[in-house]
């Protein structure tokens, strides 16, 4: 089976455990393993590309369009560094068991030792992923992630002339981030932070809060000037179901919006009978 680019050396007609295909994709960047996985999941690589683009749309990757599963050059196949960072973040948060593969330095398949191309795994113990890449049109690329003292950062470098430049730039970005940024829990989830008047309800008010903790990674100096602006819907009437969105909270620093989160009802309020 001839396949352009990196390969895991899969033999045609031979059954391969799914975990070996995943390791071949993650560690070796094996295009043969990638296509095999795509065909197993969706029947054809083209069908899997449709799945990829659907997920990209769901994640808000507005500057991404896939044409193949391997990342090989195609004039209509593109993404951005921001979208890659978002994709990496979702991978880490939503598939933690799968993400453990990304820090493995090597594996052996078909009696061939295959080594992870991410040199940062050897240079920095806090680095646990994510993925290298190279094509003649994109240059040398690396999405890297590291975690120190409970704070995780993701770095994306693309278009480097050499692989060493990619690793050097990625390490510098991570060091800069850990030195000058901080991750802080600003508000607790499922905890009352505001109340709102309720019309025609068995209770005349409803507690409001966040669905989950509000955690932000920002420059250290920014934390000193954080303020909250609560925007609660007007004329809230019963019935109200628990979890109903009834407003938003804006997080600002020196008047600049950092993020917004929905304010939800923490309890239900039934309609008052007559």
PLM regions: where:
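Domain-terminus/edge residues, biased toward the C-terminal soluble/receptor-binding domains
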Residues: 62, 75-78, 82-274
